[in-house]
């Protein structure tokens, strides 16, 4: 569960002596020579020696390094919800339909089921994960899904909706005394489930560089190491989107038959096309 991961990271940071200040919002970043000053919503200003912006797709630091950038709406929206596991077991599953697909996978030792449901539509939706929606809208969009999928959707009593936007990988990840990390540097669509993983890889490489170099040199080395892989993964995720939403009945039948046949005789070959993503060991590179 993402909340469990965040709690572990927070605990590790505190054990390492990090001073965590919760409930703070950086509203603006200004430069003073090579330094960056952080202006907070409460009116105070922080003047740190160095800044690492791991502040997500709405990063305040990214435009300070790169200028303003607007993502574009892909014509797809996603719902996310968590429900008690209705009996799916420990498997991750994907259900596909015309212009839609739904992914479910277990959390917390199989007690919970995470649901991510994606639909193609023209109606625009805001970017971000915190926009509540009526569960009835989710169920209506996937009304013809059956079996375990329908059971999971029936159990949803709270759901969030967000628009899927495509962003360019930031041209500049590091400058002077500042660096970007995670979605702040490279927002990704969810079609390879690599957003959080890329951020963790970033963090490991940046920490390794900081252990062996001066911060400004470490920032530059980190960006040089990480940018090519992040760009490659994001391009693969972008290219994976259409495969879930085939509308032509013939193409859909052929593709799904090929998947079933391939999975029956050589499951590892199908999965192997993304070995370079999932088998990557950032600690060894």
Language-model features and meaning:
Residues 232-235, 239-277, 285:
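Alpha-helical membrane-targeting segments
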Residues 58-59, 78-80, 100-103, 185-186:
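Histidine-centered metal-chelating micro-motifs
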Residues 33, 65, 153, 192, ...:
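Short, flexible helix/strand-to-coil boundary loops that buttress conserved ligand/catalytic motifs
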Residues 1-6, 10, 15-16, 42-44, ...:
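Conserved FAD/dinucleotide-binding core of flavoprotein oxidoreductases
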